Amino acid sequence: LGGSGNAGQYTITIGGSGSPNAGGASSPSGIVKVSDQSSVVSALGGGSTGNDGGSGGGGEGRGEGTLTTTPGSGTAGQGNDGGTASINSTTAAGGGGGGGAGAVGSNAGDSIGANGGVGLSSSITGTAVIRAGGGGGGGTAGRGLGLNGGGNGGHNANGSAGTANTGSGGGGPGGNRNDGATGGSGIVILRYQFQS
């Protein structure tokens, strides 16, 4: 998921602390931020609805028959774009999924929120673990699922938070709810190689 360091020391950061409303939603939401430490490479899940948030772009939002945003764009080499909202319903409907580190967010069906994009696998600790998935979009007829630590979207409810220590996006709200969930906090893995 990205590394940095000198002389045998490598730092891997997976994600970062997410701010509220990360992931696809049916209303505007907040941003998942990339670490501002220049020595750290980050890979996040879904960002804010309709914004270029963190590494993964947020899902497109929809409310009361009007497309309120366009999908956010992912950061090259770190995350992917968010998915589009549904276009067939004349009422508040499904939000697109947040982009994950490994794939774009899914596009929403009629009134059902879309799934977030998948994350990326890292085996730096010796066991492969997939992290930094996108959060699911909210919907009025069903919720989208967050993948690889991403929070589920809300079914006429607020979204669920991303899993801690994954850097994955939170789920977006559905229906007339406007509170998405925070992304999972990031982790830093240090690996040292002793020189003979």
Give residue ranges: language-model regions.
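Low-complexity, glycine/proline-biased repetitive segments and flexible coils/loops
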Residues: 1-196
